[in-house]
């Protein structure tokens, strides 16, 4: 009985989150976001640009200049201040790996055009891990390296539970498009 209540509470939290702020982010990716800062050192400099890829229900930054939530906890500006050419991918947070991967390919091509480089380093968090692996498999010539941070390479119990529920599948199919 307690497990059923926990599942219902989780579903309510997910639906509430989606309907109170993430809906616009879920509907479409806005394109790659370059992080620019004044260079303080070059300890984080890499040969190729870095593209950071968020996980399921993720974002790059939400809010405005006076109040915002940064998915990457200010790591990207620190990397930029210290020599990295770094971009934050902005993908549909509630969609398939293939769908997100195709969005990421477009953004990687944008990064290549902006920087004039022929490859990128991809870093993916959570669902971003399988997403960057998809890109590496489909467009290996674009990729210098692939790194997963807490990647969901063997699936996710939470995702399995949500997908096994018809009501949640219906909600995510509607919102995820």
Predicted segments with their positions:
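Bacterial N-terminal signal peptides that target proteins for export
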Residues: 2-11
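Hydrophobic helical h-region of N-terminal Sec-dependent signal peptides
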Residues: 12-16
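C-terminal segment of classical bacterial N-terminal signal peptides
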Residues: 19-27
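Cleaved targeting-peptide boundary
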Residues: 26-36
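Extracellular, luminal, or virion-exposed ectodomains of exported proteins
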Residues: 36-41, 45, 158
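Active-site catalytic motif of lipid deacylating hydrolases and related acyltransferases
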Residues: 42-120, 168
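Serine-dependent carboxylesterase/thioesterase catalytic core
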Residues: 54, 102-177
